[in-house]
Design a protein with these regions (language model features):
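Hydrophobic alpha/beta core scaffold segments
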Residues: 584-588
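N-terminal localization/anchoring segments of enzymes in phospholipid and broader phosphate metabolism
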Residues: 1-559, 577, 581, 593-734
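Cofactor-pocket helix-loop regions in the catalytic cores of large enzyme subunits
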Residues: 564
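Glycine/threonine-rich ATP-lid/beta-loop region of ATP-binding domains
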Residues: 569-572, 576
Length: 734
């Protein structure tokens, strides 16, 4: 390090000390969590607006923004409303009360919805029409031939399923299911007085929402595929549902309910049974949001507002089709692959491209898995082989979210049926996966597995599998540790990393983790792993503090960290202090970031970037320079209070230099990304990096290409070895 740099770092360290911890923890130096999350959804929306993306990819991104916003209202907004109802006045990390947050959220979400529908109406629908796919937005725009088609479809397919519901003295306002699409109407009796009556019908979720109409051909013989939404067909035929009435007005509407249920786990006699009860209540929680067409009759809106008990700020008048998550169905229509990013095939893992079994390969050395660039198959194979292997004595695994037809579940059940000791922690409290996890828990119990439902007051979010195997030299423990779920479906869509190892100390720690989960054991110390909520916060703070001390001493100091969210005040304050000491900090944070970056005297040494691309960034990676003796960790935890204090999480080290090199390259690419990255500015906004004079770098695309090249090179190497083995030169007689 140059003399000038050491002097500069010393000055910054002095400045940081002068400011003190109070300055680093001042609310003005933090961003509100909810508003930061909304900025993330805006970054996803940017991908929908980006005309360099294939058209159907843009549909997908817009659908994702809508789905994200639904969950945000059902969980985050609902939670804030609960705080207000309870009279909770304590400010958040940024100094905002719950009501202040709700006020800001209302303004920002209304702006976001306008941006969504501007993208939908002005950009995507015209582009679809230009590519031969015409969405007929209003039933009044149908041609006579199309009208006959949809009327026949209504009579034969839709009418038998519908349940029209009137409201009068004997029939109260119906219970409207969470997220259901409905059509509300005001009716007037034929030949009766002028009094208006309210009625509604739910758009049945059991029927497809996108209905294909006959293809039309223009005078130049160009074919157009025509589609219409189911609610338009129902609205066109509303008169058939209320024969003795005239339809004065009718409009689709949709609601979001509070889905953020809480459990008193101490009082629950049976956790599984209690969660099943709460899931039923989720459909009927407080209404958090009402969506209705923007030209809806105000008399109709008044009835809905009164009966659903919705505040004015929670009403969204929508200039287009409700519930844009339907665009994911449109993305799935056949015949449009040319308008999508070509599907990437996850590549084989080079270290496993041989004839040896999984256990032999792990004994050769730790194996790094990088999904979805490399296939998830080795993780499935690990459990399957263990289930069949007569030398395997026990399998233990934690499950948070799994796929609908999970091969992991099938393998665990088979292992139990084969007489092995199988222990599985199924986290029943995984939000919106509770119902699936209850089903899997019952299936595993039926197969003979010992199923644990989790720890009281904590969610088990760690991703760990332990296989205990009898071998010639004694018992050996094989462990898989990951940053992502044991879900073979999302492993093709999410970026995650994992390690397979038989390191004895990691094996000991893995055993201690499962003993902690299944019994009352709390280890006093750990060999290699750091586990929340016991020690993980302390571990991270010590690692950051070490870099701070190195920087103050003029030694090499830097931090590179990748995660989903960053909103822990104690961690952020430590990062601010490190920055003031001269530590270079590069953060890749996909979603929420409550830290302010690039502010002189606070965070001038911190850069934050978010990558939004074809795959969902989900890995957690932490690199600490440590005065030249670099340490690299991966894990399941973000830097959030819930992960560090209220969940069981695991941080694990990467030990092999060869694997460290790969992770460094991985992170270097993400820090060089100038196509899909967004860089946090001092004012809290995000901007795309300046690409002038630079080659375009897309980290996800580059990592795909690297995985393809690595697998190709490994195949070539094996072919050459095979050729050398088969070809034996004839020795000369001389």
């Amino acid at each position: 390090m140059k003399k000038e740099e050491k002097k500069d770092n010393a000055q910054k360290a002095k400045k940081g000390k002068e400011q003190g911890i109070e300055y680093f923890q001042d609310p003005k130096n933090y961003v509100n969590r909810e508003l930061s999350w909304l900025e993330f959804d805006c970054r996803v929306l940017e991908e929908a607006r980006d005309k360099t993306n294939p058209l159907f990819d843009r549909l997908k991104f817009l659908s994702i923004t809508a789905s994200n916003l639904d969950e945000f209202f059902m969980v985050r907004v609902a939670s804030l409303k609960d705080m207000v109802h309870a009279g909770y006045k304590k400010p958040d990390i940024a100094g905002m009360t719950a009501q202040e947050q709700l006020d800001k959220i209302s303004v920002r979400t209304h702006e976001l919805v306008v941006q969504q529908y501007n993208t939908y109406n002005r950009s995507l629908l015209p582009a679809l029409r230009n590519n031969g796919l015409n969405l007929i937005e209003c039933h009044e725009d149908l041609t006579p031939e199309q009208g006959e088609f949809v009327d026949r479809y209504f009579r034969e397919e839709v009418y038998p399923v519908l349940t029209p519901m009137a409201v009068d003295s004997s029939r109260p306002f119906p219970l409207v299911r969470n997220k259901s699409l409905n059509i509300a109407a005001l009716l007037k009796k034929k030949d009766g007085d002028e009094e208006l009556e309210f009625a509604m019908v739910q758009v049945p979720a059991v029927l497809p929402r996108i209905i294909s109409l006959p293809v039309t051909t223009d005078e130049d013989h160009n074919e157009t595929r025509n589609v219409i939404f189911l609610e338009e067909i129902i609205e066109r035929n509303m008169q058939q549902l209320f024969l003795n009435y005239d339809i004065v007005t009718s409009h689709p509407f949709r609601i979001m309910r509070n889905a953020d249920f809480s459990l008193d786990e101490e009082e629950a006699v049976d956790l599984l049974e209690e969660i099943e009860k709460q899931l039923k209540r989720r459909q009927w929680g407080e209404v958090i949001r009402l969506e209705i067409e923007d030209k809806a009759d105000q008399r109709l809106l008044k009835v809905l507002k009164r009966e659903l008990e919705v505040n004015e700020e929670d009403i969204f008048e929508i200039p287009g089709a409700l519930d844009l998550t339907v665009l994911m169905k449109m993305y799935g229509l056949d015949g449009y692959d040319h308008l999508k990013t070509p599907k990437y095939t996850p590549q084989p893992v080079p270290a496993l491209m041989n004839d040896d079994d999984i256990f032999t390969n792990i004994r050769k050395g730790d194996i790094l898995l990088m999904h979805p660039y490399e296939t998830f198959d080795p993780v499935v194979d690990f459990v399957r082989r263990a289930a069949r292997d007569p030398e395997v004595l026990a399998i233990k695994q934690t499950l948070y979210r799994v796929s609908g037809n999970s091969p992991i579940i099938a393998a665990l059940a088979a292992a139990a049926e084969n007489g092995k000791q199988v222990s599985v922690l199924v986290e029943l409290k995984a939000r919106f996966d509770e119902e699936n996890n209850i089903i899997w828990a019952k299936k595993l119990e039926k197969a003979g597995c010992h199923v644990i439902y989790g720890l009281v007051g904590l969610k088990t979010h760690s991703k760990i599998t332990l296989v205990v195997r009898r071998e010639e030299d004694g018992i050996r423990r094989y462990v898989h540790l990951g940053t992502g779920n044991y879900n073979d479906s999302t492993a093709k869509l999410y970026t995650d990393c994992g390690i397979m190892t038989c390191h004895p100390l990691i094996g000991e720690d893995a055993t201690a983790v499962f003993n902690m989960l299944s019994g009352y054991s709390e280890p006093l110390n750990w060999n290699m792993l750091s586990v929340a909520p016991l020690w993980l916060r302390t571990k991270f703070l010590r690692l950051i503090e070490r870099e701070t001390k190195n920087a103050r001493a003029g030694n090499p100091a830097s931090i590179i960290a990748k995660m989903n969210s960053l909103c822990d005040k104690e961690i952020i304050a430590a990062l601010y202090e490190a920055s003031c000491a001269g530590v270079r900090i590069h953060l890749v944070v996909r979603g929420i970031c409550c830290l302010k970056a690039g502010i002189p005297g606070l965070s001038e040494n911190i850069e934050v970037r978010s990558i939004v691309g074809e795959f969902l960034e989900h890995a957690r990676i932490f690199i600490f320079e440590n005065d030249g003796s670099e340490e690299i960790y991966m894990g399941s935890a973000d830097w959030m209070p819930r992960n560090l204090d209220r969940r069981v999480e695991i941080l694990f080290p990467v030990l092999r230099e060869e694997l460290k090199d790969r992770i460094r390259k991985y992170m270097e690419l993400e820090l060089e990304d100038n196509l899909k990255a967004h860089v946090l500015q001092p004012d809290g906004t995000y901007e795309k990096p300046d690409r002038r004079g630079k080659l375009p770098v897309g980290s996800q695309m580059a990592l795909c290409e690297m995985a393809v090249a690595a697998a190709k090179n490994e195949r070539k190497k094996h072919e050459q070895e095979e050729t050398a083995r088969v070809f034996i030169p004839i020795e000369s007689e001389n």
